Regions:
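Zinc-dependent deaminase catalytic domain
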Residues: 1-159
Length: 159
């Protein structure tokens, strides 16, 4: 077994706060993404306990983007589809959707009420609606998405 001396921390011991800790978990999940155009990781947390993790990519059993599974991502990489266009043709599940589905698969949907969603990217409208529906009460995100509906989050009481 190999022992890791550091994980990107500086020489002085800087213990991450909870938001930093769980965002690091989302960043780690992002590394599993098989999407050609954007890698996103997400973690659902309640009471400082990680409930589920997700990253964007094709569904199980479907060729991933690196293998040519998603034609939309392939066309995007070739410059034939603009960013944000033809998303309905993308085969990749979003990281947030995968984390939400994993909660359902694992039968922990009741434990999600009041949870926090950590994501390396602000969720799209569809993922935002799913998160609100299952009871997510706070989003912590690193990057923004132009179509994010902040009014919807405010109306639903999501921080």
């Amino acid at each position: 077994m190999e022992h890791l001396e550091t994980i990107g921390m500086n020489d002085s011991f800087d213990r991450p706060n909870w938001d930093e800790y769980f965002m690091l978990q989302a960043e780690l999940a992002r590394l599993r993404s098989n999407c050609l155009t954007r890698q996103v990781g997400a973690v659902i947390v309640r009471d400082h306990r990680q409930l589920a993790t997700g990253y964007n990519g094709t569904p199980p059993g479907v060729k991933n983007c690196f293998e040519g599974g998603c034609k939309r991502c392939e066309l995007r990489m070739e410059g034939k589809v603009e960013a944000g266009a033809s998303l309905d043709r993308c085969l990749c599940n979003h990281a947030e959707a995968n984390a939400i589905m994993h909660c359902a698969i694992l039968g922990i949907e009741a434990g999600v009420k009041g949870a926090i969603l950590y994501s390396t990217f602000v969720p799209c409208l569809e993922c935002t609606k799913m998160a609100i529906t299952i009871g997510i009460k706070k989003f912590v995100c690193l990057d923004t998405y132009p179509e994010t509906d902040y009014d919807l989050l405010n109306e639903a009481g999501v921080e």
